Amino acid sequence: MFFVVIIALLLIIYEYYKYLSSKPSGTPPGVVGLPLIGIYWYCLWYDYKFPYRWFGYYSKKLKSKVISCYLGSFFTVIANDYASVKELLLKEEFDGRLSDAYFIKARAFNKKLGIFFTDGDEWREQRRFALRHMRDFGFGRRHEIFETKSMEELNILMDMLKNGPINENEKKYLYKYKEMHGENGEYGFVGSYLNKLKESNIPSSYTEEYLLLTLLDFILPATISTSSNITFAIKFMMHFPNVAKKVKEEIHKVVGSGRLPTWEDRNKLPYTEATIRETMRYETLTPLGVIRRCTKDTTFQGYFIPNNTTLIPNIAEINHDPDFWGDPKNFRPERFLKDDGQFNKDFSLPFGAGHRLCAGETFARFMMFEVFATLMQNFDFSFVEGQPTRIEDKFPGIITTPAETWIRLKPYS
């Protein structure tokens, strides 16, 4: 028995030594983890719900804006300041996605589908097709009909998705769409895609499964992130009544009460728009962006980055960096405005950058402005007695969402 224990200990020591020596040479300074689980035990100790805080902590401890570690078996590099995050997002070699993770495959029939978690030639082809045809119907640019119907369609889409990703609702919707779709019909993006499926000699990536995942990749971020941002904005208005007062005064001075605010009013309502931007900085919905993958050996910030390295842009860390923002803990929309009332450059990167820039940025900005400005024009908001009111209450995830918040609405007078 004693001999078996000694052998087991020697094997553990050997595996740990092999693990310690597996870190590629020339890569960023890192944190030593454990075999199989990597640095997860650090996260459990420091802040398992919001790992961006742990990354930021060790970035300071190691005195390096770029650090490395093992997340399970994945060698990972994390960028923690604006310069390194921006380079990571713009670097073509970092356009890959971590598509082999279990939870990513599980959502896509155990395949690489959609445009969110895929890369390479198939991703480029599918993204190009989606953007080209969706822009024909108003997505991603100014379009009067699109702007008129967007609010109604958003509610319908959210109702469709209430049971989560890839369920019978989406399949029934697609089958019904196919029945309605004529030979030359053009019923939006789905109709264009179904027409594409009828063509001969099309790339093998064009399938109904790919269409389903592409729809989800557009719809879920658009609905969840937009509604979460608006909820956070209203919650912040209750916590910061002086800001809410300035927003209301600006809207009623420019728009009045006889009509609703429109996108055309946006440049005339700089403080309102700045408040939305400050909301996205103060509460970063995607704290770690969307995880990237290095597609070939390269260098980054003076370090060697081997092929297949996992890459994380710590966007939440840069949005709370006192060296960059001065007073990041303060909710201060004025930071996005120049002295003459014009907009400063937005360094908060809420929609990413580079080839992977969020395709729905125009849609999201339009929806947030329209809904937030309309609500602020027409209602006063206050907390409900006895209900949680803490500003830090939220649910972690790829997209941070607000915790349940009870709000009392009273018509503005």
Model segments located where?
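N-terminal membrane-proximal hinge/A-helix region immediately C-terminal to the signal-anchor transmembrane segment
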Residues: 2-111, 121-125, 151-156, 291, ...
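Cytochrome P450
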Residues: 1-10, 70-77, 139-152, 161-172, ...
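Cytochrome P450 heme-thiolate "Cys pocket" and heme-binding signature region
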Residues: 301, 338-368, 393-395
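Central I-helix of cytochrome P450 enzymes
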Residues: 172, 176, 199-252, 279, ...
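Cytochrome P450 heme-binding "Cys pocket" and the immediately downstream C-terminal segment
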Residues: 241-243, 344, 362-398
